[in-house]
Every structure is written in structure tokens, then in C-alpha cells.
Curated annotation (Swiss-Prot):
Subunit structure: Heterotetramer of one alpha, one beta, one delta and one gamma chain.
UniProt gene name: porC
Pfam short name (any one): POR
InterPro entries listed in its UniProt record: Oxidoreductase_gamma_subunit, PorC_KorC, Pyruvate_synthase_PorC, Pyrv/ketoisovalerate_OxRed_cat, Pyrv_flavodox_OxRed_cen
Protein name in UniProt: Pyruvate synthase subunit PorC
Organism of derivation: Methanocaldococcus jannaschii (strain ATCC 43067 / DSM 2661 / JAL-1 / JCM 10045 / NBRC 100440)
Length: 178
């Protein structure tokens, strides 16, 4: 089983990102779960969401404490949240930042998802770009399924733009780390 923990801030779409990733895994023929961590979140406050992906039925119904991957939508969280807490020894981090030299003690993949979101969407909402970036560095889900999940989640032009943001991030990660 592959377990992914998303870190973001309220209003950044971390919960939606976890759901899109799970839906993409489903379209790829896998079993999946996506769920948020509910607390006293408010816009801008740190939030977490989770996705599980497996080739067989998932029976666990608890928070993910030892993820295989961590996806960080906002690098400023590094100042206040231990985003790598519990990350498995061979785990990896995908983080939205312009810095390429982050040392988090784990394999770290960086992408300027904010820049992509601003270019493609016109707003700094990075959730779909981060799912595309994750697909690009891991291959756990296909970009075709990611785009299909996005188009199911967001209708019309909004869906098309978000699918484009995911594809741009996916291709950037393939170019950078492929």
C-alpha cells in the first residue's frame, strides 16, 4: 500500500488534491481512499489530507502516520510544521518551492507550482499542479487519469485549465528528474 500525506493551508485545496489523486488511482484500476484531517481549520491555517493507493481492497480507516510520500503545497509550512514527521526511511517529499537545494533529510523533489498556477490559472492555487508533479516523479498514477480526475472535479474551462496545470507540472518533473 502507498500512503501519501498532503500538507497545505486552508483554502489551498489540499483536500481536493487528495481526492483527485485517489480518483486518478481509481481510473488506473487501483483501490484508493482520500480523506481530510479535520480540526479547527480556517483559511490560511495548516491543514492535512491523506490518500491511500493499493492493488487490493483497503480496509484501514485511520489517519496516515507513516507516509511513503509527503506533498507540501506551501513551503512556508516548513517554518511551523514538521512535514516529514513519520515519513518512511525511503520516503520522498514533493514540495512547491523555487528552491532546488532543500535538505529535508529525505529524497526531495521541488517544483514551482505557484508559478505554473499563476501562468496557467491566473491564481496561486497549486493543488492540481502538485498532483501532476507527483505523477511525474512517481509514476504511481498516469497523467491521463490525473487529467480525467481533474475534469470530473472541475467543469468547463476551469477543469481544462487545471488539467493543463497538472500536465505542465508533470512534464516539468519528467524533464527535471526523469
Amino acid at each position: 500500500m502507498i500512503e501519501i500525506r498532503f500538507h497545505g493551508r486552508g483554502g489551498q485545496g489540499a483536500v481536493t488534491a487528495a481526492q483527485i489523486l485517489a480518483k486518478a488511482a481509481f481510473y488506473d484500476g487501483k483501490f484508493c481512499q482520500a480523506f481530510p484531517f479535520f480540526g479547527v481549520e480556517r483559511r490560511g491555517a495548516p491543514v492535512m489530507a491523506f490518500t491511500r493507493i493499493d492493488d487490493k481492497k483497503i480496509t484501514l480507516r485511520c489517519q496516515i502516520y507513516e507516509p511513503d510520500y509527503v506533498i507540501v503545497q506551501d513551503a512556508t509550512l516548513l517554518e511551523s510544521v514538521n512535514v516529514v514527521e513519520g515519513l518512511k526511511k525511503d520516503g520522498a517529499v514533493v514540495i512547491n518551492t523555487v528552491k532546488d537545494d532543500l535538505d529535508l533529510g529525505y529524497k526531495t523533489y521541488t517544483i514551482d507550482a505557484t508559478g505554473i498556477a499563476l501562468d496557467v490559472l491566473g491564481v496561486p492555487i497549486v493543488n492540481t499542479a502538485m498532483v501532476g508533479a507527483f505523477a511525474g516523479v512517481t509514476g504511481i498514477v498516469s497523467i491521463e487519469s490525473v487529467k480525467k480526475a481533474i475534469l470530473d472535479t472541475f467543469k468547463g474551462k476551469l477543469g481544462e485549465k487545471n488539467a493543463k496545470a497538472a500536465e505542465v507540472a508533470y512534464n516539468e518533473m519528467l524533464k527535471k528528474y526523469g
